[in-house]
């Protein structure tokens, strides 16, 4: 007698959230190509960092943590963790998926958190703006309504997700802000 396997009807219709693990990388890649000011504010701690020359792709890449032993040498991360103590007066950027919700079996959304932290001693810039607010503004302008490498349109509005918001973050001596974007997943 032959065993017959009856397929589960609709099994392939379920959302697999396959873009979840590549959202951080795709956001950083887009940022490398589309925003020069953020990279200058991350690399240079001077008050005139905004007026420095643009960084090369290699210089930007050197700021991104990719599993090295000492995390304190890097400025851009794809998670919210930092096991090494930060003793330098620097600016950090963290981009990571923070939450996912299945709205039904085929549609869901993913929240993407973007955190910027800057040491208080280097936060004020010579153009009468702050580093944290400038980077936050640039993140909103760069990512709101942007397709992130074919993975979904990031949005910062209450129509896509009630959790989209911007709020203060950090702990002395590092102040910061966190933005929550969302994207649909199908």
Please provide the spans of the model-predicted regions:
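Short acidic, glycine/tyrosine-flanked loop/strand segments centered on an H-E-D-like triad
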Residues: 107-124
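Short histidine-centered beta-strand/loop micro-motifs
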Residues: 103-106, 128
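Small/polar-rich, solvent-exposed N-terminal microdomains that initiate assembly or binding
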Residues: 1-104
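A general secondary-structure signal for short beta-strands and their flanking turns/coil
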Residues: 88-92, 107-111, 169-178
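Residue-level recognition of well-ordered beta-strand positions that form the cores
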Residues: 96-98, 113-117, 180-184
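Acidic, Ser/Thr- and Gly-enriched intrinsically disordered low-complexity segments
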Residues: 83-92, 120-144, 152-154
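Acidic-leaning, charged glycine-interspersed low-complexity segments
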Residues: 132-186
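Generic "edge-of-domain/loop-turn" microfeature
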Residues: 100-102, 119-123, 186
């Amino acid at each position: 007698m032959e065993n017959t396997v009856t397929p589960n009807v609709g099994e392939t219709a379920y959302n697999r959230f396959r873009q979840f693990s590549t959202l951080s990388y795709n956001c950083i890649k887009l940022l490398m190509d589309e925003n020069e000011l953020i990279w200058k504010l991350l690399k240079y701690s001077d008050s005139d960092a905004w007026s420095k020359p643009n960084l090369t792709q290699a210089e930007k890449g050197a700021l991104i943590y990719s599993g090295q032993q000492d995390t304190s040498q890097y400025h851009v991360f794809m998670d919210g963790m930092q096991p090494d103590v930060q003793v330098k007066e620097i600016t950090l950027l963290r981009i990571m998926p923070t939450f996912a919700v299945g709205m039904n079996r085929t549609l869901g959304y993913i929240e993407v958190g973007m955190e910027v932290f800057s040491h208080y001693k280097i936060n004020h810039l010579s153009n009468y703006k702050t580093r944290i607010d400038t980077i936050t503004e640039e993140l909103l302008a760069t990512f709101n309504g942007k397709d992130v490498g074919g993975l979904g349109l990031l949005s910062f509005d209450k129509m896509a997700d009630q959790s989209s918001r911007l709020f203060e973050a950090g702990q002395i001596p590092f102040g910061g802000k966190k933005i929550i974007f969302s994207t649909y997943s199908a």
